[in-house]
Amino acid sequence: MNAEFPMLNTTLCYLEQGGKWLMLHRVTKKNDMNHDKWIGVGGKFEPFESPEDCLLREVREETGLTLTNYRLRGIVTFLLGSLTEYMFLHTADGWTGELVKDAARNEGVLEWVPKSEVEALPVWEGDKIFFRLLKEDRPFFSLKLKYEGDDLTEAVLDLSLIHI
């Protein structure tokens, strides 16, 4: 790995139930790039994990649920200064166990949010693009999002530039 240009691998999952997504309101950590944003559940890969291993572990840690039906929807590449993050984006509609609402207390607060209301919440501009793709049930996609600070400056979907 090039220390000058680090890479990060993460997973993110939106659990779906009754027209709602389970979302995490990131309000706990003060020095958090996602502070006060609403995102799905997920996190960073640990050594030797596959995307699926990371997905299952992160969802279990942050919700108390064990996924039984999930789908890889796309890969989102974030360009954040010199950092490149590859995020494996999933949705899930099957699980076992009971939701532990305070399982993610170190990260924030879990809430079921109607899909129609998500874009009105404090979310990253690029997330609005993949929310639309998820709602349209778009087949597997590759989305590249370039940020300068908090500002989305470029979005490329399946190698086509999107006007933002």
Regions found by a protein language model. Name each.
Residues M1-M23, K44:
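Conserved N-terminal beta-strand and adjoining loop/helix that marks the start
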Residues E16-K20, K29-K30, E46, A92-E98, ...:
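Short, charged/polar surface micro-motifs in flexible loops or helix N-caps
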Residues N31-D36:
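A conserved beta-turn-beta hairpin within the catalytic core of GNAT-like acetyltransferases
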Residues F45-T68, F78-L133, T153-S160:
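Unchanged
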Residues P139-E148:
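Low-complexity, intrinsically disordered Gly/Pro/Thr-rich segments
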Residues I162-I164:
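Conserved small/polar residues in nucleotide/adenosyl-binding loops
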